[in-house]
Curated annotation (Swiss-Prot):
Organism: Brucella canis (strain ATCC 23365 / NCTC 10854 / RM-666)
Protein's GO biological process: translation
Record's keyword annotation contains Ribosomal protein: yes
Domain of life (superkingdom): Bacteria
Protein name: Small ribosomal subunit protein uS2
């Protein structure tokens, strides 16, 4: 595999170049703005192209060395797209609401994930011994936990990289990433602060077509990383006397 290809035409057709109304801009975005049309800022796609390529490379490189990527997008038009892209590329996601401390208080989050796993087991076994009302309460609790944590249930620990749609809405997620030294790839619209982002992608963060394009490219970059990792493992495994045990086949550690 190789890094996913994209063209300037695809970016234009998806509306990536359309920023917000000029009065809503963040002056820090001035270097990324090409001009304005009908009081709407137009983003400079000649900068978006190389920056998006850099973002795709860091995603692929992170996954190739065994790292995890967390997709974050909780706004209505991003939610389903984020989950689909993460699932398709064997990564992780938060698409309902960012809970404060989701990264910085991972121990507490892990306890909630353990509770979610327990509920999965109970309900898969038809919740023997519970009344109809008790079962309904368990199902509601599970549904609530799954909505918040289902996308990170199997992540194991904090991610190695975060990909974010809408840096204003996901400001807490970015703050937590900064505190933990987790690099951030993010789409930055004309009303965003680019200073907080390690790998910025200047572009529209509201149009569903634009969001779908970013997520598809990031997912394909992650898949490229998986292919590279498997290729490297194939070389290493062939040279070893004993085959390594796949992590997925090992019994989960106590408290994991």
């Amino acid at each position: 595999m190789a890094l996913p290809d994209f063209s300037m035409r695809q970016l234009l057709e998806a509306g990536v170049h359309f920023g917000h109304q000029t009065h809503r801009w963040n002056p820090k975005m001035a270097p990324f703005i090409y001009g304005e049309r009908n009081n709407i800022h137009i983003l400079d796609l000649s900068q978006t192209v190389p920056l998006l390529n850099s973002a795709l490379k860091v995603v692929s490189d992170t996954v190739a060395r065994g790292g995890r990527v967390l997709f974050v997008g909780t706004k209505r038009q991003a939610s389903d797209i984020i989950a689909d892209a993460a699932n398709r590329s064997a990564q992780y996601y938060v698409n309902a609401r960012w809970l404060g401390g989701m990264m910085t208080n991972w121990k507490t989050i892990s306890n909630s994930i353990q509770r979610l796993r327990k509920l999965d087991e109970l309900l898969a076994g038809e919740a023997q011994g519970f009344t109809k009302k008790e079962r309904l309460n368990l199902e509601r609790e599970r549904e609530k936990l799954d909505r918040a944590l289902g996308g990170i249930k199997d992540m194991g620990s904090v991610p190695d990289l975060m990909f974010i749609i809408d840096t204003n809405k996901e400001a807490i997620a970015i703050q937590e990433a900064k505190r933990l030294g987790i690099p951030v790839v993010a789409v930055i619209d004309s009303n965003c602060d680019p200073d907080q982002i390690d790998y910025p992608i200047p572009g529209n963060d509201d149009a569903a077509r634009a969001i779908a394009l970013y997520c598809d490219l990031i997912a394909r970059a992650a898949l490229d990383g998986i292919a590279r990792q498997q290729g490297a493992m194939g070389i290493d495994v062939g040279a070893q006397v004993e085959a390594p045990v796949e992590p997925a086949l090992q019994a989960p550690a106590e408290g994991a």
